[in-house]
UniProtKB/Swiss-Prot annotation:
Pathway: Cofactor biosynthesis; molybdopterin biosynthesis. This is GTP 3',8-cyclase. Catalyzes the cyclization of GTP to (8S)-3',8-cyclo-7,8-dihydroguanosine 5'-triphosphate. Pfam families: Fer4_12, Mob_synth_C, Radical_SAM. It comes from Vibrio cholerae serotype O1 (strain ATCC 39315 / El Tor Inaba N16961).
């Protein structure tokens, strides 16, 4: 079968190359985070969702790998809710060309399973920890599992992870004053703490107005206290990462409302239902699943993705209050 050469790497009309696939494997989540699924997961009306199978995942990852993608992040929902999660990790890790296999998890299964996930081929781990105060953690997530999640992070280091990334969604009047506690936590731990600005989605207008706070004040603090901006790799995510000689940990800032945020976009998304999303805040996804049924469909799959890439907008339209059709971040993997 003819493969994509390096010259045929996935690229849009703005000369952005795509090294990074965010692949959702389920919409289901067992937490009730204020900024995502405050009422818990509710299946869509109509027939039950049929999420991508392992073979469909293998085919879509193979197509991306043949066209220059080197990193896959497995997302959800909560990806570890899938009973075949370990098999999915292994399948992706065995794909020629894939160098990094990451996942983002709420951490509730970490302590028990992170060892087997690492053995399956997981190379990077992100855990959502929106507060270091157990009561605030429970208020934000709807689950009293703070100690369980923290034990999972400790276990990740025990089984050999050299760094764990911790995601914190910044929310005014909830956790935005915890910076000193977070800084103390990463002083002696190799944790990359990633502060993520609250993003507006279709179902969260009121929450956004009440709790959005910019990451600029944190960046100003970092620059004023000896932190240095770290260079980005081709397949890194959108975070601006800062390092300090006195800290084992790092700090990342993800600020989607900042000017030129989209200029360095290097990632595409495939939903758990097999739809290609050119942007987290774009319109309806592009159907890929009909081309994931047989290995011999790969050329057609690649051609469809490459064609649709030429429709990728130069930037999102969040500043206009347009968050696309994304109802909440669990729907296409955040």
């Amino acid at each position: 079968m003819e493969r994509c050469s390096v010259a045929q790497q996935f690229e849009d009309r703005f000369q952005r190359k795509f090294y990074y696939l965010r692949l959702s494997i389920t919409d289901v989540c067992n937490f009730k985070c204020t900024y995502c699924l405050p009422d818990g997961y509710k299946p869509s009306a109509g027939r039950p969702a049929s999420f991508l199978t392992v073979n469909e995942i293998r085919r879509v990852v193979s197509a991306f790998a043949h066209c220059g993608t080197s990193k896959v992040r497995i997302t959800g929902g909560e990806p570890s809710l899938r009973k075949d999660f370990g098999e999915i990790i292994h399948t992706i890790a065995q794909t020629p060309g894939i160098q990094k296999v990451a996942t983002t998890t709420n951490g509730y299964r970490l302590a028990k399973h992170i060892g087997e996930w690492r053995e399956a081929g997981l190379t990077q781990l992100n855990v959502s920890v929106d507060s270091l105060d157990p009561r605030m953690f429970a208020q934000i997530t709807g689950e009293n599992r703070f100690q369980q999640v923290m034990s999972g992070i400790d276990r990740a280091f025990e089984v050999g992870f050299e760094q764990v990334k911790v995601n914190v969604v910044l929310m005014k009047n909830l956790n935005h004053l915890e910076l000193p506690q977070f800084m103390a936590w990463i002083k002696t731990r190799p944790i990359q703490l990633r502060f993520i600005e609250l993003m507006q989605t279709g179902e969260m207008d009121a929450l956004f107005a009440r709790h959005h706070v910019s990451g600029i004040s944190i960046r100003d603090y970092l620059f004023g206290n000896g932190w240095l901006l770290k260079a980005r790799a081709d397949n890194d995510g959108p975070a601006q990462v800062f390092i300090h000689p006195d800290f084992q940990g790092e700090i990342g800032l993800i600020m989607p409302y900042e000017k030129d945020f989209c200029r360095s976009c290097n990632r595409l998304r495939v939903s758990a239902l097999g739809k290609l999303h050119l942007c987290l805040f774009g319109e309806q996804g592009i159907e890929l699943r009909d081309l994931l049924q047989d290995d011999h469909q790969e050329n057609a799959l690649i051609e469809r993705i490459q064609t649709q890439l030429q429709n990728k907008a130069e930037t999102h339209f969040l500043h206009d209050g347009n968050s696309g059709v994304t109802p909440h971040l669990a729907s296409i993997g955040g």
